[in-house]
């Protein structure tokens, strides 16, 4: 049996880096075709998938994979000790009268997350299902945002991606790295049992509040930024379960 990871047919810097990282690994990364259809003769050998969430879900069904991810309402259950902001999870219609609020749909598909002066400012609002579930939070200013690929409660690789209102993948300072790892250890000791063993966690510094959890994302569809591709690949593989 081959250990095949199905790659989205859409070429990205991340998928190209994963492909390169797999050269001396036990894994074979294959894009197959542009039809999002894994040929029958390869389906038993596909042990993981990486790409857009819709693509991954289609391939998972074809190849009998379980894609691990946190529960939809997971973030709303995390203590403010770690989020440093109030987070709510409810139907979109329940926030119709809120102003100056951050909103993100729980399925990551309905609309682009962001800060909105009014909920009705969401692009395409009139066509949205008002019963759909969303996260909301108070608006905060992030001074730094960092992506972490986590396996078995350990950060395997990490990369900054946002600093002072600009895209930035430069290395953390020694103090930032030390403080983030300390924050992560305190967080994971309390919440490890609520997460899959392979997951992507984003942490950051909120102005005036310090280190905080941003969110959790499935490894099988998360961007790498400047993370070590070989280490990220192992987390991605472990985030998919062959049934």
Residue ranges and their predicted role:
Residues 2-189, 243:
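Active-site nucleotide/adenylate-binding loops and adjacent lid/helix of ATP-dependent enzymes
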Residues 31-33, 198-200, 220:
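Extended, compositionally biased low-complexity polar/Lys-Gly-rich tracts
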Residues 52, 202, 228-231:
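Poly-acidic low-complexity segments
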Residues 137, 201, 214:
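Active-site flanking residues adjacent to catalytic metal/cofactor-binding acidic residues
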Residues 146, 196-207:
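A short glycine-rich, hydrophobically flanked beta-strand micro-motif that places a catalytic Asp/Glu
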Residues 194, 207-243:
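C-terminal active-site "lid" helix and adjoining low-complexity regulatory extension at the edge
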